[in-house]
Curated annotation (Swiss-Prot):
Family under the similarity heading: Belongs to the MnmA/TRMU family.
Segments for region (Interaction with tRNA): 150-152, 312-313
Keyword Nucleotide-binding (UniProt): yes
Matches recorded under Pfam families: tRNA_Me_trans, tRNA_Me_trans_C, tRNA_Me_trans_M
Database matches in PANTHER family: MITOCHONDRIAL TRNA-SPECIFIC 2-THIOURIDYLASE 1, TRNA 5-METHYLAMINOMETHYL-2-THIOURIDYLATE -METHYLTRANSFERASE
Record protein name field: tRNA-specific 2-thiouridylase MnmA
Subcellular location: Cytoplasm
Organism whose genome encodes this protein: Streptococcus pneumoniae (strain CGSP14)
Site (Interaction with tRNA): 128, 344
Amino acid sequence: MSDNSKTRVVVGMSGGVDSSVTALLLKEQGYDVIGIFMKNWDDTDENGVCTATEDYKDVVAVADQIGIPYYSVNFEKEYWDRVFEYFLAEYRAGRTPNPDVMCNKEIKFKAFLDYAMTLGADYVATGHYARVVRDEDGTVHMLRGVDNGKDQTYFLSQLSQEQLQKTMFPLGHLEKPEVRKLAEEAGLSTAKKKDSTGICFIGEKNFKNFLSNYLPAQPGRMMTVDGRDMGEHAGLMYYTIGQRGGLGIGGQHGGDNAPWFVVGKDLSKNILYVGQGFYHDSLMSTSLEASQVHFTREMPEEFTLECTAKFRYRQPDSKVTVHVKGDKAEVIFTEPQRAITPGQAVVFYDGEECLGGGLIDNAYRDGQVCQYI
């Protein structure tokens, strides 16, 4: 058996059950483990309680229980500069960003990884549901987590080969109930703590209220694609393509009682377009353009790839053909896709392996750009 005691692994600990069990498993496997709590956002919850303080208390309790040293590190400036400013800029541009993808790329596997190296880390580890496997030549492949409902490779798709070389995902081969069971058997104080939801820096707060603190809302007209006035929208940034709720129009416009959906945005005229029916023509597209395209291992500068893709988290894979040129790609769908949303990630898979991905710029329907923004 190999001696892991000479291998230092720095674990990103959030105060949740997943990262607690990550640290526990590595400690049990004999690694030299250090726990790090990242404070990325200065926050209080609806009751005025600082959530970071409460989470750090949980980290301290777990670290003491399993017998590992722990530190807290403040990445608020890095988070604001590299993630939150991007998040706001995307909303200003009428897009719907995915801050979790950027947070992993810029904070958890850049700022945190760099900090861990100053502590003499050989690897960093997180509680993500993903797997890494190493070829004989040392190349690392990132595979989906075994728990299909929890697989987080979608959010890790912008990681580089260099980052993956230094990363361990101890939970990748486990299902979520097994993780809870391990925490309970070890008597960890976080065993029954509920999973966090929502964007990391917003937590459980009302999204609309949160966003309005940073971006002034500009109400405008809500219209059908054929020009019927449907009332007023609260501000384009509050709506995403394919959204059903929150339109306030129900079936009051006579005739068809089919539900209404957001089908497009015109940023220059501040118009929100709506249409009836889940598969409204305006929601369907046949291809997309992506930028910031990146692969988890070395690929040619220009190539074509037949693979599957996800256009949002927890969506089933769809067959696609990808034409890559530098950091841009055209992605052609085998079957038309619904509600392709600029700003979201498109992520490519070859079977179990996550190959990488990019950010969606435009969706196309038979060669014509969809009026999404």
